[in-house]
Amino acid sequence: MSTHNNSPKEKPVDMNNISEKLDVVNNAPEKPAGANHIPEKLAEMTSSEWIAEYWKGINRGNDVPCCCPRKMTSADKKFSVFGKGYLMRSMQKDD
């Protein structure tokens, strides 16, 4: 007898099945106002360009580059110190 209760809502997602992943993304609840939004990664962008665009937005105090102004928190400022090294390394080795 299994003690695991798999309700239909909490079915594990098969990460190899694209349509299941899309269902999870498309059916996700709306984020509350002011929640961090991650910019779209355009097809022609490399990962490095996308990360750089994301960081530009954070450094300007925005959730999304050029949109949704938000005051930078101390956590953002502390994280940026660590994140910049990772960003520089990823830009050097990426596509």
UniProtKB/Swiss-Prot annotation:
Coiled-coil ranges (or none): none
Transport in keyword set: no
Role played: Inhibits cGAS-STING-mediated type I IFN expression and NF-kB activation by inhibiting TBK1 and IKBKB/IKKB. Inhibits host TBK1 phosphorylation.
Pfam families hit by this protein: UK
GO annotation terms (biological process): symbiont-mediated suppression of host cytoplasmic pattern recognition receptor signaling pathway via inhibition of TBK1 activity; symbiont-mediated suppression of host NF-kappaB cascade; symbiont-mediated suppression of host toll-like receptor signaling pathway
Transmembrane segments: none
The name this protein goes by in its record: TBK1 inhibitor DP96R
UniProt keywords, alphabetically: Host-virus interaction, Inhibition of host innate immune response by virus, Inhibition of host NF-kappa-B by virus, Inhibition of host TBK1 by virus, Inhibition of host TLR pathway by virus, Viral immunoevasion
Family indicated by similarity: Belongs to the asfivirus DP96R family.
